Regions:
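Active-site neighborhoods and metal-handling regions in enzymes and metal-associated proteins
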Residues: 1-593
Length: 593
């Protein structure tokens, strides 16, 4: 394999010489800026042999490097050995950025190539500005891997299916009407939608082209008077074709998007995440308005049907979680279970629920020190057995036809240290404080993020990830525009939005703690000072009481905790057998000092 990588890099260098390029940048992205990448666009993996989910390869005529984050330092070091590719560890003070490195190894007036189809317009613009400061030019080059990658996987061609109105709550025609109103407000004559979850939401269609995300590879062009779906046509059954015709949606081949955009005249609304090649094509004869996609906001506010679906999906997911937790507490003493095996068992419990449609992201099952790796993914090389001691951090989720779930529980498997209990309780305090928040209209997630962090800040502890994100409805588990983050996120929090609440503490080499619910923003009250909102928990699953130091909790926090557990029991117990019901009754019994 190592010799193959060396040969692949050599073939890329020949391509670069042919196109007068001194360097080529290969990211871990696709034309639609997706979180998960279809195999057709896994060029970074092919050229380097590095199989991690995040990383960027840069190849010059005599050097090569891979930039990746701390999750993959060990894996990358092993996989890159003897390939001629140097590992650059991101976010370490001694590690140069890609631009800094290129500034050192290239000469003035050299050309750096990228494939515009897999680099966003925004990222390309920023990269171009930074390189120009070093008198280096950025060039949109042809995709070299169409030529070099001889057994490249085809574009995904899985069948698309209709997401029924009983789940969607709003028809495709009504959604397009809303989008056209937004286009007019932006003084535009059309919009190109490239984010796959936005296309799926607009058309009330779903697919299976992307791991964990029920979406399909496509573009959607909506103008004042027409709508055109760009897609590989054999993905469409006769039923879906008839559905599109009924909704006045034209169908064009996926490969014709560039030509059609070059012919488009008018003013086109594009998101900054549009890929650079599409942006360049649209600029041929059109005026361009770069602005957030209106679909992002429309999709984020769930309608009543979607909210009802979320409640049903969360109940089913809660039943699966209770069955799993009860099984796990007993199974851990056998010594036969590992991080990977318990993930498979959780999948079985979820798959037994109606309307299950796969997981919503790759499960994070981190035992003891592995829990401190924020985005840990157990693989055979890292998998470890569970013992009746310490804690297991389990972050998981599922796709159901009527909702998407995302939940984290830190599970006590046996004896804990005082430090572990303290950290667990600090996280719980932050989690409860944000859960209890009431806030006025006009509030954004940044203003509330600190509520979850304050208990930890008082102890001199912090976490570096965001506290929460939006959740799609049988769509992507991570969606915007709203988030809880320390850096400013201007999107306002309004009723109908779903959002996660997931503070954590991570101590390298020791343990990790995170507790997460998905919540719904709902009206709270009207006062002389305005309209106020609050959070309603959607997730229904017990929170482990065994690690809680009750003296650290306020009376108000204990009251919230007990009320939440009462809700969990009341909602789930009718769906359980007698043994499961008794177990749930015990683990949700009132917390006392």
């Amino acid at each position: 394999m190592k010799s193959e990588i060396i040969n692949r890099i050599a073939s890329l260098r020949n391509f670069m010489r042919k196109h007068k390029l001194s360097a080529f940048i290969i990211p871990s992205t696709d034309p639609h800026s997706g979180e998960y990448i279809p195999k057709h666009w896994e060029a970074r993996k092919w050229i380097s042999g590095f199989t991690g989910s995040a990383g960027t390869v840069v190849v010059t005529l005599d050097k090569a490097g891979l930039w990746t984050d701390s999750r993959y330092f060990l894996q990358a070091a092993e996989q890159l050995e003897n390939t001629g590719i140097t590992l650059f560890k991101e976010r370490l003070p001694e590690t140069p950025s890609i631009v800094e490195w290129l500034g050192c190894v290239l000469n003035a007036e050299d050309n750096v190539g990228i494939d515009g189809w897999v680099n966003s317009y925004q990222e390309t613009s920023n990269l171009q500005k930074e390189l120009e400061k070093k008198q280096i030019h950025l060039t949109l080059a042809p995709d070299p891997f169409n030529e070099l990658w001889t057994d490249r996987p085809a574009l995904p061609d899985n069948k698309v299916f209709i997401h029924e109105l009983k789940y969607a709550g709003l028809s495709c025609k009504d959604k397009i009407t809303q989008i056209r109103e937004a286009i007019r407000r932006n003084s535009c004559t059309g919009i190109l939608i490239s984010a796959l979850d936005e296309v799926a939401w607009t058309l009330n269609l779903r697919g299976s082209d992307v791991h964990c995300n029920p979406v399909f590879v496509s573009y959607l062009l909506i103008t004042e008077y027409s709508s055109t779906l760009y897609i590989i046509e054999n993905k469409l059954s006769d039923e879906v074709k008839d559905y599109l015709t009924e909704n006045e949606i034209k169908v064009r081949p996926y490969s014709t998007i560039e030509k059609d955009l070059k012919d488009f005249t008018g003013k086109l609304l594009l998101s900054a995440n549009i890929n650079a090649a599409v942006h360049a094509a649209a600029c041929a004869h059109s005026l361009i308005e770069i602005a957030p996609s209106p679909v992002l906001f429309l999709k984020a506010i769930k309608n009543e049907t979607e909210i009802e679906g979320f409640h049903r999906a969360m109940k089913r997911d809660g039943v699966a979680m209770v069955k799993f937790l009860r099984w796990l507490k007993a199974a851990v003493s056998t010594g036969n279970e590992t991080e990977i095996s318990i993930d498979k068992k959780l999948y079985e419990f979820r798959a037994g629920q109606p309307h299950f449609n796969g997981i919503s992201f790759d499960t994070i099952a981190g035992y003891k020190a592995h829990g401190a790796i924020v985005h840990y993914e157990a693989i055979p090389e890292t998998d470890i057995p569970l013992k009746p001691e310490g804690m297991l951090l389990l972050d998981s989720g599922a796709q159901y036809l009527d909702g998407t779930t995302d939940i984290t529980r830190t599970i006590v498997l046996g004896a804990l240290t005082k430090e572990e209990k303290t950290d667990y309780t600090l996280v719980l305090k932050g989690f409860i404080q944000l859960s209890m928040a009431q806030f006025p209209h006009g509030t954004c997630g940044t203003q509330l993020d600190a509520l979850a962090r304050l208990p930890m800040w008082k102890a001199g502890i912090n976490y570096l990830h965001g506290t929460g994100h939006g959740v799609g409805c049988f769509l992507n588990v991570h969606e915007g525009p709203h988030q809880f983050r320390m850096n400013h996120m201007p999107a306002l929090l309004v009723p109908g939005m779903t959002v996660t609440n997931e503070p954590g503490i991570y101590k390298t080499g020791r343990h990790g703690v995170r507790t997460e619910n998905t919540m719904l923003i709902v009206p709270s009250q009207e006062t002389e000072f305005g309209t106020y909102y609050k959070f309603e928990p959607l997730t229904l699953c017990p929170i482990d009481k065994e690690a809680i130091l009750t003296d650290m909790l306020s009376d108000e926090e204990i009251t919230w905790f007990n009320q939440y557990h009462e809700k969990v029991y009341n909602c789930l117990n009718p769906e359980l057998n007698n043994e499961e019901r008794e177990w749930l009754k015990e683990v949700t019994s009132p917390l006392k000092r």
